[in-house]
A protein has these predicted regions:
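Boundary regions of SH3-family modules and the immediately adjacent low-complexity/disordered segments
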Residues: 1-52, 68, 75, 79-90, ...
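A generic structural signal for residues embedded in beta-strands
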Residues: 56, 85, 153, 257-258
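Short, structured beta-strand/loop micro-motifs enriched in basic residues and often containing a Trp
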Residues: 58-68, 124-136, 233-244
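Short, conserved secondary-structure segments in the cores of folded domains
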Residues: 72-73, 140-141, 240, 246
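Loop/turn positions that initiate beta-strands
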Residues: 80, 142-153, 252-253
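Active-site nucleophilic cysteine motif
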Residues: 194, 206-225, 229-230
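...with weaker cross-activation on analogous glycine-rich loops/strands in unrelated enzymes
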Residues: 227-287
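Low-complexity, Gly/Ser/Thr/Pro-rich intrinsically disordered linker/tail segments
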Residues: 293-308
Length: 308
């Protein structure tokens, strides 16, 4: 295993500075036998590892709770996203995602060392983008990348319609520079992006245009508008937006949180969300969604929040 050894050298020693802190296992790289060296002094582990900086080179790769393709998917790594590897065993790498700190296992074959891959400059902004062999939509297709994937783009083609990316070309209408900001107002872009995904299959752990869960949808469309968001709905509830006053009407782009669920308003009455009831991304009256949650919860709506 071509990594810095787990215990950072034979003579490395670490001392806990007081009691171990409480931690969220979803975003804390601690496995019992091994932990990120950044946790040394905060949490005990028999060994600590310096993360190896890797990057997803596959179109996408599921992040799993345990090594093995039959284990539960907990999130998804998209092309061009960073993954910090702490251990490799067989075909699986254990570590955490660079964009949100989520911890899990991904297939080794989906990763390359970041030194061997160009730094991404653009995001796939369409539901999916094709990488063509030539700057011509009639040419052969090299690969298909989902919404949210990151690529390194170079100079424009002579016609101005394509950007060079690796050995291929991507249409300019399908990408935007990383970090592009969107102003949140009554016509904000989050809802328009979500509407592109109507009919996309519900996929537990998914966060791409090919399949996604409720919080994956919210995280991805916010990322595309230049806003960092955590992975799960409870994490998003804690940090995103401001509470909307009771009695104030909802508007396009507002977030509504339910028990273990989140959706985005497309107007004052209707919500778009990836849901397991319809097993896809759908638009429906907010009242219908609330009625379903009211069957199993005394508090079907946890919060209504507005991004600013």
């Amino acid at each position: 295993m071509d990594m810095k050894a787990a215990d950072i050298g034979a003579h490395a020693k670490f001392v806990l500075h007081g009691p171990e802190e409480e931690f969220d296992p979803r975003i804390t790289a601690h496995r019992g036998d091994l932990a990120d060296v950044a946790l040394a002094g905060k949490m005990f582990a028999p060994h600590y590892a310096v993360p190896m900086p890797m990057r997803c080179s596959a179109p996408k790769a599921m992040l799993r709770k345990h090594s093995g393709k039959d284990h539960e998917a907990i999130s998804e790594l998209l092309h061009g996203e960073d993954f910090h590897v702490l251990d490799i065993a067989g075909d699986w790498a254990w570590g955490y995602c660079g964009h949100d700190g989520y911890v899990g296992y991904v297939p080794v074959h989906a990763l390359q060392h970041e030194k061997k891959t160009p730094v991404p400059t653009h995001l796939i902004f369409a539901r999916a983008a094709l990488i063509f062999m030539e700057p011509d939509f009639k040419s052969g297709v090299m690969k298909r990348l989902p919404m949210g994937a990151r690529i390194a783009c170079g100079e424009a083609s002579e016609c101005g319609n394509f950007l060079k990316t690796g050995k291929g070309f991507v249409h300019v209408r399908h990408v935007q520079p990383i970090g592009t900001k969107v102003v949140f107002d009554g016509t904000n872009g989050t809802a328009a992006l979500a509407e592109q995904l109507i009919g996309a299959p519900y996929l537990w752990g998914g966060r791409s245009g090919d399949g996604l869960d409720c919080s994956g949808l919210i995280q991805m469309i916010l990322m595309l508008t230049g806003v960092d968001a955590p992975r799960d709905s409870d994490q998003q509830l804690a940090v995103l937006g401001e509470e909307i006053a009771e009695g104030e009407a909802l508007r396009r782009g507002d977030l509504v949180f339910f028990p273990d669920h989140v959706g985005l308003m497309i107007d004052k009455d209707r919500i778009i969300h990836a849901n397991s009831h319809m097993m896809q991304v759908t638009i429906e009256p907010l009242a219908d969604t609330i009625a379903r949650f009211a069957k199993t919860s005394d508090k079907p709506v946890l919060a209504r929040k507005r991004l600013s």
